[in-house]
Design a protein with these regions (language model features):
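GH16 jelly-roll
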Residues: 1-249
């Protein structure tokens, strides 16, 4: 049975980031919309996520956010990450709903951009939804998936995912939307608002989630051929809540 495209008219906008400007601080030391690190201070990949400074790693131009990865003179790569929640748990998060980013991905081997969500309560496990993960060595596909990280609490991790083939190069040459609709029973992924894949929503995902976007490098793949600089372009990040059924018609 073919799934319907996403009907955005059945949703109301709850979080709108159009990147006409960028309200970011390193750690939420002031009340900013975004912080420039994971709230738990966990780096990953082969580039260090750096504090925001004038012109790097974040710039905005005509409603487009540029996240730049750059190789410094000492050989260190630096790049950018944004999270809507700070280490105190303050900021935007939402239980259930549709989370979407419109982006143009950087070309080149070694780039590893992502748009992803983390569950707000990490006390018993970490709930993660990867709306988009892209590996520059394979410009003809991207992945989506989920994780429930329990090992740090002595449990077993749960993971699942899907690889989506696309026309070679279109993710680098055009903007596309990457979205996930989390509902109590089903979590569904969309590419350009066309249904791609779904899984049964686990009880661990019955909590607020918050969005993150970043340009990482590596993920086990060499970065000696990675273009310097590499730039992820983000048009917007929007979050929606499903309207009551009678209001959606």
């Amino acid at each position: 049975m073919a799934q319907e495209p996403l009907n955005i008219n059945a949703y109301q906008l709850t979080f709108e980031e159009s990147f006409d400007s960028l309200d970011v601080s390193a750690w939420g030391e002031r009340s900013s919309r975004w912080i420039a690190h994971t709230p738990w201070n966990g780096d990953f990949g082969d580039a260090r996520f750096t504090d925001p400074a004038p012109g790097f790693p974040f710039t905005t131009d005509q409603g487009i956010l540029k996240i730049e990865a750059r190789k410094e003179a000492d050989g260190t790569w630096r790049s950018g990450l944004l999270s809507s929640v700070n280490p105190k748990g303050e900021g935007f998060s939402q239980q259930f709903g549709y989370f979407e980013a419109r982006m143009k991905l950087p070309p080149g081997k070694g780039v590893w951009p992502a748009f992803w969500l983390i569950g707000l309560d990490r006390s018993k496990y970490t709930a993660e939804i990867d709306v988009l993960e892209y590996y520059g060595r394979a410009p003809y596909e991207f992945s989506m998936g989920f994780h429930i990280w329990r090992q740090s609490q002595g449990g077993q991790n749960t993971t699942g995912g899907h690889w989506q083939k696309v026309q070679d190069g279109i993710l680098n040459s055009e903007y596309h939307t990457y979205g996930v609709d989390i509902q109590a029973d089903k979590t569904s992924f969309y590419f350009d608002r066309q249904f791609i894949w779904s899984f049964d929503t686990p009880k661990e995902f019955h909590m607020p989630f918050y969005p993150l976007v970043n340009l990482a490098l590596g993920s086990g793949w060499p970065i000696d051929e990675t273009p310097n600089p590499s730039i992820l372009l983000v048009d917007y990040i929007h979050v929606y809540q499903r309207k009551p059924t009678d209001a959606a018609n």
